[in-house]
């Protein structure tokens, strides 16, 4: 039996308010998961990540397998001890990273052979290997090994990719069970932007049986309206009593639209990566701190924000100076602000669903940006 329990508490339209319960902690949903690719959310301490409101983080199976390697992580008793995060961790399977290698990989029925981006060595990764790696990592949510369908892709290419992912899903399920791993195992719905393929994938995954269902292949360059159309299509096709996870999608607008279409979990490097590039998220849009207009701006990133960067009195002028001088403090403060913004956005979304006012919240979210909400 999986160590995950999921409770769907209430709905407001298609928006869902729930709770994930693990032995290592509880996660209120909808939830945003900060990404710790190498076992660290870049630039800040685990205690700071927790203080910002995050209850679960994501680790990268592919990169951790290559560096530092499983033996070293096993010496620490698993990924939690290694990175000093005592809450739940979700690990991806490595499929998306293999997809991103493009010309340096070869896909067969057995799995993927690729040149390591760290030293060029030949590496093989398949469903069984991915499940073994994630067992050593001792993550709380394990993702099946799949092939991320590219965009654009013809229906034939998307079909063959989806069917391969389904065969790998069954092998992942078998390997996970044979290892005696009680971590939750999530299936991943593929099929590109073809509704019939998405339906077939969702049905086949439910026949195999998983603890949750992720929606993959919707962070690969497809237009927003096509992504939303796929979420609209899948909402009634996925089981209501299992969590839904939209992989790698992470603009604030994407989170709001995903929640409006029944998604419970999100992850993205955007808040941390953008912070390192001087892009700070606010309720009225993005502050691009490198712009000259902020050279003598005495306001914090967002007046009224409760993050340490804003309450600490650090001005946009100062942050621009730090960024231009490549000072480490700039991305640290930016990351603290961006993740605070993301976690507060999710908390506000949860409160709106509980109050039955999510649609009004959605309208005000866009109005603050001078925009109009897309049709539902």
From Swiss-Prot:
Keywords: Glycosyltransferase, Metal-binding, Queuosine biosynthesis, Transferase, tRNA processing, Zinc. Zn(2+) binds at residues 305, 307, 310, 337. Pathway: tRNA modification; tRNA-queuosine biosynthesis. It comes from Stenotrophomonas maltophilia (strain R551-3). It catalyses: 7-aminomethyl-7-carbaguanine + guanosine(34) in tRNA = 7-aminomethyl-7-carbaguanosine(34) in tRNA + guanine. Binds 1 zinc ion per subunit. HAMAP family: Q_tRNA_Tgt (MF_00168). Gene3D superfamilies: Queuine tRNA-ribosyltransferase-like. GO terms for molecular function: metal ion binding; tRNA-guanosine(34) queuine transglycosylase activity. The keyword Lipid metabolism does not apply. One of its GO terms (cellular component) is cytosol. Belongs to the queuine tRNA-ribosyltransferase family. The active site is at residues 92, 267. Residues 248-254, 272-276 are annotated as: RNA binding. Its cofactor is Zn(2+). Its EC number is 2.4.2.29. The keyword Signal does not apply. Homodimer. Within each dimer, one monomer is responsible for RNA recognition and catalysis, while the other monomer binds to the replacement base PreQ1. It comes from the Bacteria. This is Queuine tRNA-ribosyltransferase.
């Amino acid at each position: 039996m999986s160590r995950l329990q999921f409770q769907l508490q209430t709905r407001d339209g298609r928006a869902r308010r729930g709770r994930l319960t693990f032995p290592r902690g509880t996660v209120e949903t909808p939830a945003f998961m900060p990404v710790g690719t190498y076992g660290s959310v870049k630039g800040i301490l685990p205690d700071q990540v927790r203080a910002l409101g995050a209850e679960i983080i994501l680790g990268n199976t592919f990169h951790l397998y290559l560096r530092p390697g499983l033996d070293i992580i096993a010496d620490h008793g698993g990924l939690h001890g290694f990175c000093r995060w005592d809450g739940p961790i979700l690990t991806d399977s490595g499929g998306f990273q293999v997809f991103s290698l493009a010309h340096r990989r070869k896909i067969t029925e057995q799995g993927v052979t690729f040149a390591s981006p760290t030293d060029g060595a030949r590496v093989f990764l398949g469903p069984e290997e991915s499940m073994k790696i994630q067992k050593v990592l001792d993550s709380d949510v394990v993702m099946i090994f799949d092939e991320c369908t590219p965009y654009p892709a013809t229906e034939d290419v998307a079909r063959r990719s989806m069917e391969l992912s389904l065969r790998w899903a069954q092998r992942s399920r078998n390997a996970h069970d044979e290892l005696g791993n009680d971590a939750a195992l999530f299936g991943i719905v593929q099929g590109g932007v073809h509704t019939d393929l998405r339906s077939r994938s969702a049905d086949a995954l439910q026949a195999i049986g998983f603890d949750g269902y992720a929606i993959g292949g919707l962070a690969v360059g497809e237009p927003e309206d096509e992504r939303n159309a796929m979420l609209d299509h899948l909402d009634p096709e996925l089981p209501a009593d299992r969590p839904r996870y939209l992989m790698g999608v992470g603009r604030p607008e994407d989170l709001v639209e995903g929640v409006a279409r029944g998604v419970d979990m999100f992850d993205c490097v955007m808040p941390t990566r953008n912070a390192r590039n001087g892009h700070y998220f606010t309720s009225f849009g993005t502050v691009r701190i490198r712009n000259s207009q902020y050279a003598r701006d005495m306001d914090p990133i967002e007046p009224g924000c409760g993050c340490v960067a804003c309450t600490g009195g650090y001005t946009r002028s100062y942050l621009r100076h730090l960024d231009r001088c490549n000072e480490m403090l700039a991305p640290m403060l930016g990351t603290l602000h961006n993740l605070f913004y993301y976690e507060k956005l999710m908390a506000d979304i949860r409160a709106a669903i509980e109050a039955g006012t999510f649609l009004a919240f959605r309208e005000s979210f866009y109005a603050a940006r001078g925009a109009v909400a897309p049709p539902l």
